[in-house]
Amino acid sequence: MKNELATAVKQVLEDYPNGYSNLMGEPGDSSFESKVKLSEAEGVQFVQHSLSGRSVISWQARLVTTEDHAEAKKKFRAAYQQLQGLQVRIGSRAYKLRSPYEVPNLDQKFTSLVFELEPSNSYSESIKIELQMLFQMPMEWAVGALIYDRDRKDTDPGRVLRSF
């Protein structure tokens, strides 16, 4: 996964002004194949959903699913290191991804890091990049990354990774 996630996130963010039209492949029910691939990911897709009465697209990558908390935690940390400080260009503006790190705890069933685009402005405020580690039944930990629009101004985690 050496910088592969960073490259993918950069590609997706840079196509944000185009509504991801250059990166969406064949449509499914409510999802689209992603032309942006991650060799070790278990699934990468664009998902269409409704937000405040409008149709929006989000990008989701399931990086790993494992029964081993330590392995999931290691993958989560490696993904964070790829994204923290990542420089991207959206339209004519340059941004850096920033988020404080939180160590996933075995007793916590969900850890979420929401990256902000800096410098923040009215255009970039709603774009969120999120890294998640969550516990799923029967006994698995999943690590994934998401890019989505958010109208709310709060610190609650966004969408939970859906099953691919």
Give short role names for the model-derived ranges.
Residues L86-F164:
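A charged, solvent-exposed segment within the mature domains of Sec-exported extracytoplasmic proteins
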Residues M1-V56, S163-F164:
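N-terminal leader/targeting segments
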Residues G43-D107:
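Long, charged/polar, surface-exposed segments that mediate recognition or autoinhibition
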Residues M1, L5-K10, E71-F76, L83, ...:
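Generic hydrophobic, helix-prone segments enriched in Leu/Val/Ile
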Residues N22-G25, S30-V36, V44, A78-Q81, ...:
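Hydrophobic transmembrane signal anchors and adjacent membrane-proximal interface regions, especially
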Residues S31-K37, I57, H69, K75-F76, ...:
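Aromatic-enriched hydrophobic runs in primary sequence
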Residues K2, K10, K35-K37, K73-K75, ...:
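Context-gated lysine
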